[in-house]
Amino acid sequence: MADKGRLKIQCYVNDTYIPVDGTKAILKPSSGQEGESKEINLVTNSSGETEIIELDAPPFSYSQEPSRPTPYSLYDLRIERPGFQDLLINGVQIFSQSLAIQPCNLIKSSNTRSSRADVINIAPNTLNGNYPAKIPEEVDKPLPPPTSGVVLPKPVVPEFITVHAGSPNNDSAPNYKVPYKDYIKNVASCEIYSTWPESTIRANIYAIISFTLNRIYTEWYRGKGKNYDITNSTAYDHAFNYGRNLYDSISAVSYTHLTLPT
């Protein structure tokens, strides 16, 4: 692997943006990965961020054409900080010529919130993994009645969105309430490549936003008695991987397209 990608780690208190300094980050290639196998030790600064480091990645060309080998390398990350629970993140995805950003929401040792796991396993990108195909929906379909008794005059961009980490038929799967802007970036990082041209990334983000706002505006799941807005099953909605790494190129495009035009 002659090509290089980059990684920055960000550590915050729980689901806030309060930085955690002095956090130790231990990074190593995932099992079966080529290249250097040595551990890399990093420490967060007063902003809760590590320095940006270069890591081995497959050739850039792999991400530009279909039917090529997996275009990203995988790394496992362990986060340690006194006063907080350890966090393990397996399968951080590094593309050539791309900056990956790994957010780490650390739980204080005295906090035992059940919805937050200590281990995050990042699933393959949908272009590489084995995911169920989208179940076709009728173009004109009856909409469930609004749960509030009030019909919104136009789509509203929410501050938060609740994601069900499973199919609609899996009531045991956890729900995650995350900032809407972070949800869009997470979905894009799951479904497209960060190395694509800016115009291609933008077109995909438009599609993700449109579909997501439709689910919220129509109260597609809440109108059926569910306690969430959307699922992470590709058979019904978008892929979403709680706690996965994001990308600077995707975040930059998302930032300018997360509100509706006036």
Model-inferred region functions:
Residues 33-63:
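Short, acidic Ser/Thr/Gly-rich low-complexity loop/linker segments typical of extracellular
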Residues 256-262:
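Conserved small/polar residues in nucleotide/adenosyl-binding loops
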Residues 189-201, 237-243:
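Second-shell loop/turn segments in exported
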Residues 60-90:
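A short, solvent-exposed loop/turn motif at the edges and junctions
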Residues 166-168, 179-196:
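Acidic/histidine-rich, surface-exposed loop or edge segments in extracytoplasmic proteins
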Residues 87, 92-129:
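Extracellular beta-sheet/turn segments enriched in Thr/Pro/Gly and aliphatic residues
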Residues 1-7, 12-19, 42:
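Beta-strand-rich domain onsets/edges
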Residues 15-39:
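Short, ordered, surface-exposed loop/turn motifs in non-cytosolic proteins
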